[in-house]
Structure formats: structure tokens, C-alpha cells
Amino acid sequence: MSWTVPVVRASQRVSSVGANFLCLGMALCPRQATRIPLNGTWLFTPVSKMATVKSELIERFTSEKPVHHSKVSIIGTGSVGMACAISILLKGLSDELALVDLDEDKLKGETMDLQHGSPFTKMPNIVCSKDYFVTANSNLVIITAGARQEKGETRLNLVQRNVAIFKLMISSIVQYSPHCKLIIVSNPVDILTYVAWKLSAFPKNRIIGSGCNLDTARFRFLIGQKLGIHSESCHGWILGEHGDSSVPVWSGVNIAGVPLKDLNSDIGTDKDPEQWKNVHKEVTATAYEIIKMKGYTSWAIGLSVADLTESILKNLRRIHPVSTIIKGLYGIDEEVFLSIPCILGENGITNLIKIKLTPEEEAHLKKSAKTLWEIQNKLKL
């Protein structure tokens, strides 16, 4: 097949050569137009349309309109970020997964690795970029990136370095996904959830810290091990600050509705002959043990975050101990984020459960709030 197309000089009118540029523009791909920069001359070299495997295989039936779908973005592709990614993928929780990281080689490598495994998952669309535009229109954004504590560094200095990082991340997230929910995983999670709330100006229900969701899972697992019962049948809560100063609510621990405190009134105290308080000590020590042995924690927190993601995207209205603002509760007057039982759904945190605490448990919660507020008060936002 051969086509003849006139060469049009810049000095000539379109009508004088009988060429319709609008039609040409529609018919030709810009890459099939070669510019000759001589005397204002442009030369178009058309190429005949050739059949492709795709065109021979697929018959166009109708035009497709954009369909609303769910999208999750993860900021940070370190060990925690990738554990979150694979956990969400295996649960098939979203139609699209976007990954963001400044380490472009690692980002591309991790993404390709996941993409090649996508035939075994229910999420075929996995994208990545170091630019936040790839997160546009996310339903949920999970932040796992942040600075790590250096040897001898104060907690305040670590938080302040993370504030600088969060300022860049949050502004970009808000720009591209102004209606998303945020899950903060980076540590110290309670303070950084507060920072994300302040920087984003999002309503409080859309800012969620992973908080004590994992602490509570560890608590139930260890209780189950001690009793020889599956952890799903062990009901108990770890509240307050994620980490060393978390509060075990022994007054609420029960198995099949039987409160353990009814069987052992001193459970969880120094007077307890069975020393159940060691269960909570093990909860707080476990992370350090894992880090000592393998260098970091990843899988448990990844599965925990996927659990939160499922409750939000599927609007399950399940109860999770996540970090949220608790000003006005339990005698706390400061704007601090601590973990209490929250109902999670498509709007984020929809309701709080007013769990009854003993005076001792409430005192521990207030102490955590005071410690956090002393640090938050010194932050430069």
C-alpha cells in the first residue's frame, strides 16, 4: 500500500495544497510524523495500519466507561511496607495497589517481584513511582516510611526528624487523595498519628494509628498458649501507648464469657501467684527479641495492618484497638492519640467503645497521655 501526501511549506495555506490537517492529525500518530527543519517544511510519512495479535484476538464490543474501584497506597517499601503489601495482596482487598519510595531501584525491584506473582493473587494492578501522583484517588493510604532511631538519639529528636519527613509525605498525599483515610504505622506511632492529623487537617475519623492492634494480638496469642486455647477464643485488650507503656486490661480478659479475674482476683498484679503479668511483659519484650534475632519485625505488623485495611474497605464495623484522639475520655484533657477499642468501617473510625477500666488501669492511661503530651508540646509543626 502506498499513500501520497503533499509536503506543505509554512508559507502555503492548507487550502492551496488540498490537505486537511485536522484529518491528518486524527489519522496519523505523532510519532509517524518526521519534521524536516529546512525552510519551514514539514513532511508527514504515513504508515499503513497493520494487524496485531491483540486486534486479531479481541473484537471491540462497546466503549468502556471508568468504573469506581478501591485503591490502596503504601508509602515506604522497607520490610514493614512490603509485609503490608503482600498481606493486602493475599487477602485480595483492593483493585489497585500503589507503592511509593525514594529508593527507586528497590521500589522497582519490589514492584516487579509482586507483579510477577500477581497471577497467584486477586489484585492484578500493582503500580509504583517515587512521585506521589501514582497514589491519586486512593481510598486508603498506609504510611510505613520514617526515620530510624540512631544510637543515643533522644525520642524527641527522632520524632522531630520524622516530622520533617511527614511534612513532605502528608502534603503530597493530601494533594492527590484529599478524601482518603490514613493509617500510620511508622514509629513512634501514637505521636506520628497526631502529627499526621495536624499536618493533613483531616477529620479525626480518617486518621488511624496502627496502635495496639498488634500488641493485642500478641496478648491474646500468649494467653491462648498458656491456656491451650486458640487465640481467637481469647478476649483481652492492650490499650494506651503502643510499646513499653501499654496498658493490659486484665479486668476485661475472658474466655467464652468467663472473666479470668473471677477465677483469680489478683490476676495481672504483683500478688498473683501464677504471675500472669509476665504475659504482658512478654508482649512488650517480643518485638525486641525478634529484632535481636532477625534485625526487624515485619510479618506480624503487616498482617495486622491488612486486618485494619479489611475492616475499613469492606465496611465490616469490627472493633480494633487503634490509636485515635482521646481528649475528653478517661480524664484526659490533652490532644493525644492513644489506642482504645474503635469501630472501623468505610468512613474510618465511626465509634468508640467506652470500655470500663479499673482505677489502676485508668491511671496508667493518664500517665501515657502525659508522657506523649510532653513530647508533642515541644514539636515544631
Swiss-Prot record:
GO terms for cellular component: cytoplasm; mitochondrial matrix; mitochondrion; nucleus; oxidoreductase complex. It catalyses: (S)-lactate + NAD(+) = pyruvate + NADH + H(+). Signal peptide: none annotated. InterPro entries: L-lactate/malate_DH, L-lactate_DH, L-lactate_DH_AS, Lactate/malate_DH_C, Lactate/malate_DH_N, Lactate_DH/Glyco_Ohase_4_C, NAD(P)-bd_dom_sf. Pathway: Fermentation; pyruvate fermentation to lactate; (S)-lactate from pyruvate: step 1/1. Keywords: NAD, Oxidoreductase. PANTHER family: L-2-HYDROXYCARBOXYLATE DEHYDROGENASE (NAD(P)(+)), L-LACTATE DEHYDROGENASE A-LIKE 6B. Belongs to the LDH/MDH superfamily. LDH family. This is L-lactate dehydrogenase A-like 6B. It comes from Homo sapiens.
